[in-house]
C-alpha cells in the first residue's frame, strides 16, 4: 500500500506561507532567475481575474491591475519540503521525497492507513500548508489520486478509478 502526499502550488505556498494577509488577494509567482520571467503558479483569485500561467508579469498586470507578483523563495521551498518530509516520515519508515512538494510513503502494514494519512494532512494544515493525499496499491495510482483528491482519496480498485479519467488528466500531473 502506498500514499502520496502532494502540496499543490508548492512554490506559491512556500512563498506565501508566512503572509496570511495575502489570503484572498490575486497572487502570481515568477522565477526571477529565468531569462524571461513568466508566471509559473497562481492562486484561484488570480485565475478568476483572468491571469494564466505562462504570461509575463506585465501581461498578468494588464489582465488585473491589483495582481500581486511574488518571486520564488528557494529557502522557504527547502523549509516546506523538509516539513513535508518530516510529517511523511511519521507514517512509515519507507518514504521518498518524490519531487518538490511530493512525498511517497510505502506501508508494510495497511491498518489505519487512511486515519494516519488524514492526521498528517491535518497537521500540515495546522502548519499553514494545504496538502492532499492519495492512497492506493501502487505508487503511480496513489500519485494520481493525490492530484485528484479534495483532501484524502483512497483507491481500492485502480481499474475502476482510472477507467473514466480522460487521457488529459495524465498530462496535467
Please give the residue ranges for each predicted region.
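Compact, charge-rich alpha-helical regulatory domains located at protein termini
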Residues: 146-173
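Short, conserved secondary-structure transition motifs
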Residues: 135-149
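Residues that scaffold, gate, or flank divalent-cation-dependent active/transport sites
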Residues: 1-104, 109-111, 115-121, 125-126, ...
Amino acid at each position: 500500500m502506498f500514499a502520496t502526499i502532494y502540496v499543490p502550488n508548492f512554490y506559491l505556498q512556500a512563498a506565501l506561507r508566512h503572509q496570511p494577509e495575502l489570503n484572498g488577494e490575486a497572487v502570481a509567482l515568477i522565477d526571477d532567475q529565468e531569462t524571461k520571467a513568466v508566471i509559473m503558479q497562481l492562486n484561484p483569485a488570480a485565475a478568476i481575474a483572468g491571469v494564466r500561467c505562462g504570461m509575463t508579469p506585465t501581461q498578468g498586470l494588464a489582465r488585473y491591475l491589483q495582481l500581486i507578483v511574488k518571486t520564488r523563495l528557494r529557502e522557504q521551498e527547502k523549509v516546506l519540503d523538509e516539513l513535508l518530509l518530516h510529517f511523511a516520515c511519521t507514517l512509515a519508515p519507507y518514504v521518498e521525497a518524490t519531487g518538490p512538494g511530493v512525498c511517497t510513503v510505502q506501508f508494510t502494514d495497511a491498518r489505519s492507513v487512511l486515519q494516519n494519512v488524514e492526521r498528517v494532512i491535518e497537521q500540515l494544515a495546522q502548519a499553514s500548508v494545504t496538502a492532499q493525499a492519495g492512497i492506493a496499491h501502487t505508487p503511480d495510482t496513489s500519485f494520481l489520486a493525490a492530484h485528484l483528491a479534495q483532501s484524502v482519496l483512497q483507491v481500492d480498485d485502480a481499474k475502476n478509478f482510472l477507467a473514466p479519467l480522460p487521457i488529459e488528466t495524465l498530462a496535467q500531473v
